[in-house]
Amino acid sequence: MKKILYVATVAEHFYYFHLPCFKLFKEKGWQVDVACGGERELPFCDNRFKISIKRSPADKENLKAYKELKKIIRDGGYDIIHCHTPMGGILARIAARGERKKGTKVFYTAHGFHFYKGAPALNWLVYYPIELVMSAMTDCLITINDEDFAFAKKHLKAKKTVKVNGVGYNLSLIHI
């Protein structure tokens, strides 16, 4: 059985945007696991790992979340790790480094970069260098708008960069 792990800061992100994707993977025979914070119940998932990912890159509690996530990923034997939200994406991509060497694919969906034309300089100083480094740990970077797609293609280092209109999947990317 193929396995996918979704990672984000909070369960509400998945509840409001990704349940149809969970359902699709289940219908195709995949094991669907989720790692995130929050109490909301999530249908269509086999295992729910409650980890407390903080939104700030400087929050020291993210070190604990990273260690938990690394163990989940190492023990899970996932084919795909699909991460969302800035900190969920950062922690999952770092935690998955070893498994990528074994063939696990890491997807990151950028639901709008925090650095964009007209964004505060602080956003560029903090988030752009982080995403530049993280993109090198990304097999497929999924963007949802033209500005992010063009920027990512030109300046970031993901193996593959695609644009999806809104939230969803281009099924040709994952061959399920």
Model-predicted segments: where are they?
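N-terminal subdomain of nucleotide-sugar transferases
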Residues: M1-G37, G76
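Active-site proximal beta-strand in glycosyltransferases
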Residues: K3-L5, R97-Y116, E131, I142, ...
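Nucleotide-sugar donor phosphate/pyrophosphate-binding loop at the beta->alpha transition
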Residues: Y15-F17, K60-K67, K105, F115-V133, ...
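Conserved nucleotide-sugar phosphate-binding/catalytic loop shared by glycosyltransferases and other
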Residues: E27-K64, I72, K160, V164-N165
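A short beta-strand/loop micro-motif in the catalytic core of glycosyltransferases
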Residues: I81-H82, M134-N145
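Short His-centered aromatic/hydrophobic patch
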Residues: C83-G89, A110
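Helix-loop-beta element that forms the nucleotide-linked donor phosphate-binding surface
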Residues: F149-L171
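Conserved small/polar residues in nucleotide/adenosyl-binding loops
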Residues: I174-I176
